[in-house]
């Protein structure tokens, strides 16, 4: 399963994420096999632990009842959660975190997530989500593996670091070599000159 990042702006924003709002149904959980209750997706807890290690605080939102949301949040290792929320509540939660100066990612897969996805600094959609969610999203994770979320953040951080490193060395090279190639040493009495072809 791959990661699709829409553009360079999304790549830059993704590396700065410090807070993440996740939708429970469909994003964190699988449909109930026996109709009795949802289960966490495979590797959900592992993904949450990786995100915590990266310094990212998670907030789980759900329209479900308190007891069920609390149980799944604790099972996943998420200490911030809200229950019986409406789509507007998710949007308000993202806005409130942004007003605190946080860089917020929203992870969702449904129509009721689209408003919060549009507001977030970075919007992440699961590849099996609705067309609306994937249209709004800046990052799309192909498949249901939640470990792709920390992978996407690591990818963005490494890519931006490599771009900055390359720009630094290109600047140093040009600052030194262009004056040499232009004959600056010759102007100060040196009788050697580097050919511009070098």
Where are these regions (language model features)?
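Membrane-embedded alpha-helical bundles of multi-pass transporters
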Residues: 1, 32, 56, 76, ...
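Cytosolic catalytic headpiece
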Residues: 5-112, 116-122, 154-157, 174
């Amino acid at each position: 399963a791959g990661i699709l990042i829409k553009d360079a702006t999304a790549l830059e924003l993704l590396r700065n994420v410090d807070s993440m709002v996740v939708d429970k149904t469909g994003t964190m959980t699988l449909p109930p096999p026996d109709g009795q209750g949802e289960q966490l997706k495979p590797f959900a807890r592992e993904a949450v632990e990786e995100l915590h290690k990266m310094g990212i605080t998670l907030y789980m939102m759900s329209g479900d009842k308190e007891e069920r949301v609390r149980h799944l949040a604790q099972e996943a290792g998420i200490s911030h959660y809200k229950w019986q929320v409406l789509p507007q509540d998710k949007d308000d939660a993202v806005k409130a975190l942004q007003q605190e100066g946080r860089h917020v990612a929203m992870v969702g897969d449904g129509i009721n997530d689209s408003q919060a996805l549009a507001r977030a600094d970075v919007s992440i959609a699961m590849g099996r989500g609705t067309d609306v969610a994937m249209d709004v999203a800046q990052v799309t994770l192909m498949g249901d593996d939640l470990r792709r979320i920390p992978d996407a953040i690591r990818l963005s951080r490494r890519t931006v670091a490599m771009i900055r490193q390359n720009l630094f060395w290109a600047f140093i090279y040009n600052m030194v070599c262009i004056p040499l190639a232009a004959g600056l040493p010759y102007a100060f009495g040196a009788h050697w000159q580097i050919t511009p072809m070098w």
